[in-house]
């Protein structure tokens, strides 16, 4: 069993594409309906009031307003509060 694979052979040349995950709109930022708030794998953040969850666990705004991060029952949640109430 050769451990040297021979001339013109390499074990390198693999790299995965970037996933572009993370928080896209931070607390206090005003969003419109449909805007992506968090891209994630799994539910690191859970949807709260005015927030929907996509099939890939992406959180997005269902209503216009300001983004608010908080906790509920020990979970990190993202809510949308009315823009007038946020000011």
Curated annotation (Swiss-Prot):
Q: InterPro entries, per this entry?
A: Ribosomal_bL27, Ribosomal_bL27_CS
The protein's matches in SUPFAM superfamilies, at most eight in alphabetical order, are given as: Ribosomal L27 protein-like
Q: Is-annotated flag, keyword tRNA-binding? A: no
Q: Which GO terms describe its cellular component?
A: cytosolic large ribosomal subunit
Domain of life, per lineage: Bacteria
Has keyword Ribonucleoprotein?
yes
For this protein, the record's PROSITE patterns field holds: RIBOSOMAL_L27 (PS00831)
Q: Could you tell me the keywords of this UniProt record?
A: Ribonucleoprotein, Ribosomal protein
What processes does the entry annotate via GO biological process terms?
Answer: translation
Query: Which Pfam family, any one, appears in the UniProt record?
Result: Ribosomal_L27
Mention one GO molecular function: structural constituent of ribosome
Family classification: Belongs to the bacterial ribosomal protein bL27 family.
UniProt protein name: Large ribosomal subunit protein bL27
């Amino acid at each position: 069993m050769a451990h040297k694979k021979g001339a013109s052979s390499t074990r390198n040349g693999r790299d995965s594409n970037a996933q572009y995950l993370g928080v896209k709109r931070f607390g206090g930022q005003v969003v419109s309906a449909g805007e992506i708030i968090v891209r994630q794998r799994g539910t690191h953040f859970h949807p709260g009031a005015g927030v929907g969850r996509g099939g890939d666990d992406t959180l997005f705004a269902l209503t216009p307003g300001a983004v608010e991060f908080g906790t509920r029952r020990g979970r990190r949640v993202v809510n949308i509060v009315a823009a007038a109430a946020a000011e």
